[in-house]
Amino acid sequence: MKLGISGGAGEAMEGELSFVSPARSSCFSFEGGGSGSPTWVSTVEALLRSPTSSVSDGGGGGGGGYNSPARASSPLQKQIPYCRDAGDFSSLTWASTLEKPLESPSSCISDGRGGGFGSPTSAFPPEKLLISPPTCVSDNRGVGNVGGFPSLPWASSLERLLTSPSSCVSDSRGVGNADGFPSLPWASSLEKPLTSPSSCVSDGRSGGYSSPLGASAEREREVREAEMLLRAIAERYDDCFLRLRDAAAELSDLHRERLRLAAENLHLSLLLEELESEQRKQASAMAPPKLEEDEAAQGGAPKSISIRSPGYLSQKPPQGQARPQRLRVRASQAMEISHPNCLIFVMGNQCSPKEAAAAGDEEDEEDKGGGEVEVEAYRQGAAKTELCNKWERGACPYGARCRFAHGLQELRPVIRHPRYKTLPCQMFAAASGCPYGHRCHFRHSPLRAAAAESFCY
């Protein structure tokens, strides 16, 4: 291995290893493409500080170069002025820093397939690299950047890179961005690029969507639509509330009107009932009497033959005995017995029996030509003293055993009280009428003045 030093007279190396002087540009080269691993080199700071220095792997650009210098045969005391065969090297495990070459505007970091060196493992901050405007970051496929190197997981932030107006964030498929680099999982914040007017955020399936200005406009439009919807709902609610209030008021008015009409209806019904009762009373008072002649012409039969006699007030016979009483009446009055509904009044013997017999003898002497008729009268309740109702309807099931008369020939006269049928009936004038009918002991028709002794009802 030869070590060539250009740019001045060769000087002897000292016993101890010294650093390479950074006064001139220096370069390491090896014969035959390089040898193995010089261990005497502790730092390449001077080499990296040179503007024209380049670091590359064995298969990249440059001359013969050398690979993996891990050892050295002789120390370097002077600086290397220039390099005839600028070689490349890869995998600098002994390099402590790469600050100076990264500060160079033309510096570039690439993988083993392009220019430069690949997969640097030494930890150094990429802030200086990211500050440089032409600096490009790319994946190991070399898309979207000039040099192209894989995503650096040791990068702490992308604030300075993302503050660039032309910065763009895209997914690993390279859509939606100009240069297209994969999504950086180590990016902690995207505040600065999102605030940039020209920034674009894409999901990788389309060419990106509108800027934040468009998103804000769309959001404002949605807010306006929501406000309009809420305003319409509020107006609808107010309208429904007003309608409900009007309906409730109308319902209360209808309820009060119904109560008023019910009260008026009750009052009118009471007045109508009073008027009808008054009309019935007037009609019953002004009704003409029903003449017996009309009933006789219609063929009606008397229910009984009643004879008023003071003998009705005498002592009643024992129960179960029905003995007739012989009464003497005038012949003219006796002839009226055949008239239906005939009532015979026998002038009462209101004195003692002896006086009555004497008075009767005198009357016989006075009325020799007129004559008298004796009539047998029975008390009320005796057999054959009232006409049979079933016989009047057509046929009586009892036949000859019936206790009621089956015709005028079987009808017997009945002794009545002296005041029988002399007073008007109070129940007959009522609207319901008298429940006793023809058996009532009170008069149901007005008494004729002409009938003093005998009259028909």
From Swiss-Prot:
Top-rank lineage group of the source organism: Eukaryota
Pfam entry (one): zf-CCCH
Record Gene3D superfamilies: Zinc finger, CCCH-type
InterPro entries membership: ZFP36-like, Znf_CCCH, Znf_CCCH_sf
SUPFAM superfamilies: CCCH zinc finger
DNA-binding recorded as keyword: yes
Signal peptide from the UniProt entry: none
Protein name: Putative zinc finger CCCH domain-containing protein 21
